[in-house]
From Swiss-Prot:
GO CC list: cytoplasm; nucleus
Details of cofactor binding: Binds 2 Fe(2+) ions per subunit.
Compartments (UniProt record): Cytoplasm; Nucleus
Cofactor: Fe(2+)
Superkingdom in the source lineage: Eukaryota
E.C. no: 1.14.99.29
Lineage, highest ranks first: Eukaryota, Fungi, Fungi incertae sedis, Microsporidia, Unikaryonidae
Pathway info: Protein modification; eIF5A hypusination
Entries under InterPro entries matching the protein: ARM-like, ARM-type_fold, Deoxyhypusine_hydroxylase, PBS_lyase_HEAT
Protein task: Catalyzes the hydroxylation of the N(6)-(4-aminobutyl)-L-lysine intermediate to form hypusine, an essential post-translational modification only found in mature eIF-5A factor.
HEAT-like PBS-type repeat residue numbers: 50-76, 83-110, 165-191, 229-255
Family named by the database record: Belongs to the deoxyhypusine hydroxylase family.
Protein name (database record): Deoxyhypusine hydroxylase
Amino acid sequence: MDIEVARKNIGCDSVSIAKRMRSLFYLRNVLLPESARAITEAFGSKSVLLKHEAAYVLGQMRMEESVRVLLDVLSDEDEDEIVRHEAGEALGNFRPREEIVEALRKYSNHPKKPISETCYLALMKLKDGSDIVSKFGSRDPALPMEGSFEEARRILLDKNECLYRRYQAMFYLRDLGTSAAIHALGKSMEDDSALFKHEVSFVFGQMRSRESIPYLIKGMEDEKEHGMVRHECAEALGAIGDDAALKALSKYLHDPCDILRESVEVAVDIHSYMTGDEIEYCNAE
């Protein structure tokens, strides 16, 4: 393992997406400026999935060297909205500064909902002013609410409620982790917001409960669903590591939707890791 090997893997479109993703998360765990710079190689790729994950990782690492790159990605009107959304979310993890706040305010009015909703959430998180790493090891786009299951479920499912409060309810239910919480989250997959449903799918991947599999399969298989939702459903299924999940994933290994097909390849690789005897997923071999 080393940074240079990982950088070369990430920057080469002929390397499998599964291998590039392993390299990316290897770099995520090496908190050095060189790692952050290596990750930026991904933004020259044709892969929307890789660029999206690179933006996510840079937001988790919070290296100051990444801010300019993330601002550039967010502002690039030629970039895919899935990548731009993730850049906006990543910026919400940094300490507030004028250039970040100004950019988020600007793009919170963007006509593309995944971008505008993400930037609104990032602004609300910066306003909250707390820097909390969840028990799942992630910096999330909202802080979990305080309250009861009943209150969280009501807020989560209320489409007229403030989006940030709904996210807070979502993360409360994730941390609660009960069967009732899982089914409340599953019910929320009927929402109109692709961004919201994609985050619920991500949360299911963190929880790794078999009870969420039917909701994830339904989201992945819906050809009318936004690619950001279908891809996140696929990756969550891979993280759960269940045979039923693998069977569902296998149907989409050659799907024409690029981000879904690549996510399925990554998910199958993660499933292999979760159910096999490999010691380390994050490698740059």
